Amino acid sequence: MPVARPEPQEPRVIAHVDMDCFYVQVEQRRNPVLRGQPTAVVQYNDWKGGGLIAVSYEARGFGVKRSMRGDEAKRVCPGINLVQVPVARGKADLNLYRSAGSEVVAILASKGKCERASIDEVYLDLTDAAKEMLLQAPPDSPEEIFMEAAKSNILGLLSDAGEKEKNVRAWLCRSDADYQDKLLACGAIIVAQLRVRVLEETQFTCSAGIAHNKMLAKLVSGMHKPAQQTVVPSSSVQDFLASLPVKKMKQLGGKLGSSLQDDLGVETIGDLLSFTEDKLQEQYGVNTGTWLWKTARGISGEEVEDRLLPKSHGCGKTFPGPRALKNSASVKGWLDQLCEELSERIQSDLNQNKRIAQTLTLHARASKENERDSTKKFPSKSCPLRYGTGKIQEDAMKLFESGLHEFLESQNTGWSITSLSVTASKIFDIPSGTSSILRYIKGPSSAAPPAIPDSSSVPEDPSLDNDVFVKPIHEEQCQPSMSEKEDNNAHSASAISAKQRQANEEKRISKKLPEVKGTSSILKFLSRGQSTFHEKRKSDGLICSHQGLVDCMSREFFGSKQS
């Protein structure tokens, strides 16, 4: 459900940058012959030519759509170039596109807080950069940057095509603008500067939305594509939302949006204005009702998270129609490949970024034989993540078996799996320093052995309530050794101070792991996938913690400084 967050008192400048048919651009950079040609990137699948996942604007002009498959696209546009995504382990390998996206992120992050939302889209909080520009007299911005900013689409600014740039320049330069609009104008110039840099340094074009919050910036970033940007002044918000279809709003594309249409007769966001906050709360609960009331007014307090790295790693594969998996052997074969890729990615994250993932989750889509219309879904299953390809493969299969047993409800019937995915989540940074890492892994000493999570137990982390933790694979590895029992007995004495207990604990771990010296040794220790690592983290509760502008700009726009 959506969360109603309070909006900051100070005005913000938020941008949503969206790459233009990014996969196609990456392939065009690899093979410049494709530039200007109708091109589409197809997913790994030879059925009917494969599914289209990106379509160039040249191909769209012929009527090619992403919902088509390769064979249909060729019928619509015989001259289309179909480029297949790279393949690894029998499935699409997106590392080429992830790497290209990282090039773009490195540039965009130079101007403020940057949140990487996906391979090809980013949120930016440019508030500080806009304020700094507003205080400059004159600011340092070349004419070509201002020219790019002057091409912006300003919502609510009426002008014919011939007068557009002139009117946008006037809007950017106007001396009577309020503080919020002046910040937005600076944001438009900063985004234009970043987009020019991205094009020069990567050969990629991108579009952007600039507004006072993430919700509005996201909504308008795709309004004028390709290679354009759109600005939403506060004075234009209501008119913009008045005609926006409910299903176009994030969080309203599913059941909640359908409920608004069916129960309240709401078809556009503007229609929500006729309902009081109390009425919406009565219908949908306090939190959701408040969120709907604020959304109708363009209010959103969601902040840009300063995150350049993904919050999770996932690998998946679909098996449509006759490709569905119908026995455990075929499921295991594909799970092993998915887990191998996942293991490589989390190991790379560990080595390069010093981050550890805590939770392994398995998702699947399934159907029972002769029950094609069944509404029961295959349950997602989670367990503490153990590093090492073999361990991940073993645990993932156990998760699948647990989910299948629950899905079938003890019925002796056939089944089909049409989608499989494994995800590593709950990622945290490793604290610097060997002793800190040891403390973080082990936590405070306990006289009791680690508890064994059962499939019926409720996860301690509220965000994992929809998942079920299954019993660890090797229960015997959870039992304390003789030396551990002795230490636990010793530590139970109340006369030992907390400081002394911590010293004894680190000494005990050091004896057990004499090779651990510095962070690199710890990384090696973790990569070996010691069973005590994930079990002790779970038992200790660690799973849930954790440049000049044109003269008019200089004279008029910056004539009155703001503090």
Identify the residue ranges that each predicted region occupies:
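Basic, low-complexity intrinsically disordered segments
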Residues: M1-S563
